[in-house]
């Protein structure tokens, strides 16, 4: 259950998703969809929630790496002393990863429902990097189950997966608005 001393991720995720939905802007170029379409709303909600959870997982993995390094070097002070034990922090990381992965999977599936013209809708960059991110997270979760991957391995895979996800969303926006529009 959520009785661990780690805060529930919904405290951060839900307001972040709401903010993203309020600030959403039309994608440059391509065909615009009716945003009142409930299926598209589900796609957006699933995708933004997955992104927020996986962003939290990336932050959690950085904290876990710092905590582990300070404990290993016997320099645990300040914030690290106030954190839950490593095992609890790692469990929280994988809870975020599993939930984010499920939502990312659903977001990708629902996204494919809206593809009319992959190139004209400027979806190639976003889709390719999202699928690479999905594969990285799938590999990490499989490695955890199959080989018991933990700590630094989990940190590296989490940050790699989130890096690809970041490239999918921020990178595609940069490519469309800066490189292609120039």
Please place each PLM-identified region on the residue numbering:
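Transmembrane alpha-helix boundary signature
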Residues: 1-11, 23-35
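Cytoplasmic-side transmembrane-helix entry/capping segments in multi-pass membrane proteins
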Residues: 7-18, 153-160
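Alpha-helical transmembrane segments
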Residues: 42-62
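Membrane-interface interhelical connector segments
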Residues: 67-89
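Transmembrane alpha-helical segments of integral membrane proteins
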Residues: 108-112, 134-149
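Short alpha-helical packing/oligomerization segments
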Residues: 113-139
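Interfacial loop-to-transmembrane junctions
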Residues: 143-164
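Juxtamembrane boundary at the C-terminal end of a transmembrane helix
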Residues: 167-182
